Curated annotation (Swiss-Prot):
The gene is frr. The modification N6-acetyllysine is found at K162. This is Ribosome-recycling factor. GO terms for biological process: cytoplasmic translational termination; translation. Belongs to the RRF family. Its main location: cytoplasm. Responsible for the release of ribosomes from messenger RNA at the termination of protein biosynthesis. May increase the efficiency of translation by recycling ribosomes from one round of translation to another. GO terms for cellular component: cytoplasm; cytosol. Keywords: Acetylation, Cytoplasm, Protein biosynthesis. GO terms for molecular function: ribosomal large subunit binding. The keyword Protein biosynthesis applies. It is found in: Cytoplasm. PANTHER family: MITOCHONDRIAL RIBOSOME RECYCLING FACTOR PSEUDO 1 (PTHR20982:SF3), RIBOSOME RECYCLING FACTOR (PTHR20982).
Length: 185
């Protein structure tokens, strides 16, 4: 019983950490990354389709992404979708390829992005703490029903706290990496 609760808490905390890492990977840092365009959806014959399914996105150099659209007739729609996104990017068409130069970030924009990343980190920490609370509540219910001893309850709470500390440490490490990446020129 307790081991199931612990495993469930561990899995849910890992999901919180991964969701945070995925969320901050979408935040532009001034360095080209194909994941920057992951959230872009293109209208493909009347159906909203993720860009990844319509084209390959590669890094041409540190400030340029290269998009190779599989169906050339979709190039204008892909360009339009990138311009319509809130990323502030202006794609250039060059034959079958689309190049997306990434403008350098201003100091003010870097600070704004840092605040956004810190907010995301706080939400991730809160999610991890909620998982801890849920796990501890389940253990308390077992204690109340006399299914486990007080020693087991205390041991379980300590285990869950260690999991929480580890998950928050991972979040802090990812936050520090992203902040350092944002502040590089």
């Amino acid at each position: 019983m307790i081991s199931d609760i612990r495993k469930d808490a561990e899995v849910r905390m890992d999901k919180c950490v991964e969701a945070f890492k995925t969320q901050i990977s979408k935040i532009r840092t001034g360095r080209a990354s194909p994941s920057l365009l992951d959230g872009i959806v293109v209208e493909y014959y009347g159906t909203p389709t993720p860009l990844r399914q319509l084209a390959s996105v590669t890094v041409e150099d540190s400030r340029t992404l290269k998009i190779n659209v599989f169906d050339r007739s979709m190039s204008p729609a892909v360009e339009k979708a990138i311009m319509a996104s809130d990323l502030g990017l202006n794609p250039n068409s060059a034959g079958s390829d689309i190049r997306v130069p990434l403008p350098p970030l201003t100091e003010e924009r870097r600070k704004d992005l840092t605040k956004i990343v810190r907010g995301e980190a706080e939400q991730a920490r809160v999610a991890v703490r909620n998982v801890r609370r849920d796990a501890n509540d389940k253990v308390k219910a077992l204690l109340k029903d006399k299914e486990i001893s007080e020693d087991d309850d205390r041991r379980s709470q300590d285990d869950v706290q260690k999991l929480t500390d580890a998950a928050i440490k991972k979040i802090e490490a990812a936050l520090a990496d992203k902040e350092a990446e944002l502040m590089q020129f």
